[in-house]
Amino acid sequence: MQDTQRSARVTHGLLRAGEPHDSRVVVQQCEVGLVRVRRDGARLEFAAPPLRRTGPLEPAVLHQIIKALRLTSSDIRHHQWVDNGPGWCAVMLSSASQVLSLQPDWAVLHPLKVGVVGPHPPSHEADFEVRAFIGHGAYEDPVTGSLNASLAQWLIGAGLSPSAYVAAQGTAMQRAVAFTCEGVAMTSGSAEMSQIA
């Protein structure tokens, strides 16, 4: 079972079971440490953890990603370490359709955890498409709070996105979820999860 799915199930189960001291707050142990998850109606909100590693990707790491995703260096618009615990690195492509067409070479991607983001056309309900590829284990995660939190910090902080945007993830797996990011805050649509700074 994937760690993200396990965490989502545990948090969902905790919200429905027992009587915590404050029924609006659950504290979840994550790689980054303890994360307070606040319930607001059907939404879950949690503070975006600080980035542990930022800055441009090293040339060797970027080359590995380009090769693993079957891209060329000109396909990469921007790249960055966006590690808030799990070790995420990220690349931005020129379009959401390019992101959706990716078919990684898992053997080359190993052991990286790579987030890929690309803009949708203005008429689309989401501003960006996000995919999360985990090289160790060779799988794609359909909904990744830690990645979307760190992408929001990077994209908004670097002026690569507006201060409020919607990102879709899971589309390529027919499991689409929308994350709404405001400032360095984020909410997730069908899972109704919010992330606040």
PLM feature segments, named:
Residues 1-2, 9-197:
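Active-site proximal loop and beta-alpha junction motif in alpha/beta enzyme cores
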